[in-house]
Swiss-Prot record:
The gene is apbE1. The keyword Metal-binding applies. A lipid is attached at residue 20 (S-diacylglycerol cysteine). This is FAD:protein FMN transferase. It is found in: Cell inner membrane. Keywords: Cell inner membrane, Cell membrane, FAD, Flavoprotein, Lipoprotein, Magnesium, Membrane, Metal-binding, Palmitate, Signal, Transferase. GO terms for cellular component: plasma membrane. Pfam families: ApbE. Flavin transferase that catalyzes the transfer of the FMN moiety of FAD and its covalent binding to the hydroxyl group of a threonine residue in a target flavoprotein such as NqrB and NqrC, two subunits of the NQR complex. GO terms for molecular function: metal ion binding; transferase activity. Mg(2+) binds at residues 184, 298, 301-302.
Length: 350
């Protein structure tokens, strides 16, 4: 039995910086991009900014890391004392007070969950843990039907409610052991939060990323739009499938081809279908979404990834989303994009 676990450095994130931030070859010294980076939420963050001197850059680095650490304390399922895990551990089914940020994230997640027919399910945590992609250890044997059914009984968006009352925000669950997992949208939220920090700091030209979620504004060091490359679904790093301009938007990619392990001779994807309780097995290997915010993009790409190519395309058409898909076909891949996504393609602009 092969229990080798394969995990990419970016935990399956397959959106790359395209090298257009001029960090190494600026147009002129005054327009050089300052690049800051670090680690958060089990992945990496990167901030590229224009017009920031060395002293401000170091202060900015500290603010970025502090903010991301706070986001992690809000959303982490790996920290038992995070705000989210305190809600998960509580057996009380009465309304539980939470922050406005938490309510915003959960509200959007529930909305996308409904529009993807339950495919984007932030209560899928028990199944994620059962299959070894959460804080629990990886299984040594394939979970049986009884274990899957028991985990599924603790899931379901219908068990979670958002309450806004007299200026206060609450989450309420109707089963004590409901487990909410916001890792599917955490990177998107954190990227948007970094973008707001840049605005607060008076920085109007930036590209920020947390894992596979990115947000940009303004022009890069060469006076051109920030560009992002979508990676080909191969083990070769920096192999580019397409390049897009995302100025003023968020982008996120969900992929099934890097975060997996092998168990009982089968490849186990980290993407779990809430309906079956099992990892996906369809041919869709990558979904990229461009949306007004990275949080929205991060939520949609997860739901569409679960649905598979045919059902996902139907939802994309219904919702008018900007989406790019890569589908396994024989020994190669085929691509599909919505008309809304095509408007962001660099090749379509030139």
């Amino acid at each position: 039995m092969d229990m080798t676990f394969f995990r990419a450095a970016l935990l399956g994130a397959c959106v790359l910086l395209s090298g257009c931030d001029s960090a190494t070859t600026p147009a002129s010294p005054a327009s050089t991009a300052t690049v800051l980076d670090g680690k958060t939420m089990g992945t990496f963050w990167r901030v590229s900014v224009i017009g920031v001197d060395e002293a401000k850059a170091e202060a900015l680095r500290a603010k970025v890391q502090a903010q991301l650490d706070a986001d992690d304390r809000l959303l982490s399922t790996w920290k038992n004392d995070s705000a989210l895990m305190r809600f998960n551990h509580a057996a009380d089914t009465r309304p539980w007070p939470v922050s406005e940020a938490m309510v915003d994230i959960v509200t959007l997640s529930l909305r996308i969950g409904a529009k993807t027919h339950g495919a984007m399910d932030i209560t899928v945590g028990p199944l994620v843990n059962l299959w070894g992609f959460g804080p629990d250890k990886q299984p040594v044997t394939t979970p049986d039907a009884q274990a899957i059914a028991a985990a599924k009984a603790r899931t379901g968006l219908q068990h979670l409610q958002v309450i806004n009352q007299s200026g206060r925000q609450f989450l309420q669950k109707d089963i004590p052991d409901l487990f909410v997992d916001l890792s599917t949208v955490g990177e998107g939220y954190a990227a948007d939060h970094l973008a707001r920090l840049m605005e607060q700091e008076g920085i109007s030209r930036y590209l920020v990323s947390v894992g596979g979620a990115l947000v940009s504004r303004g022009m890069n060091g060469e006076g051109k739009p920030w560009r992002v490359a979508i990676q080909k679904p191969t083990d070769r790093e920096n192999a580019v499938q397409a390049i897009v301009d995302i100025n003023g938007h968020g982008i996120s990619t969900s992929g099934s081809y890097r975060n997996y392990y092998e168990l009982d001779g089968k490849r186990i994807s980290h993407v779990i279908d809430p309906q079956t309780g099992q990892p996906i097995t369809h041919k869709l290997v990558s979904v990229t979404v461009i949306a007004p915010t990275a949080l929205e993009a991060d939520g949609w790409d997860t739901g569409l990834m679960v649905l598979g190519p045919e059902k996902a395309q139907q939802v994309v058409r219904e919702q008018g989303l900007a989406v790019y898909m890569i589908v396994k076909e024989g020994e190669g891949f085929k691509t599909w994009m919505s008309p809304q996504f095509r408007t962001f393609l660099v090749g379509e602009k030139n």
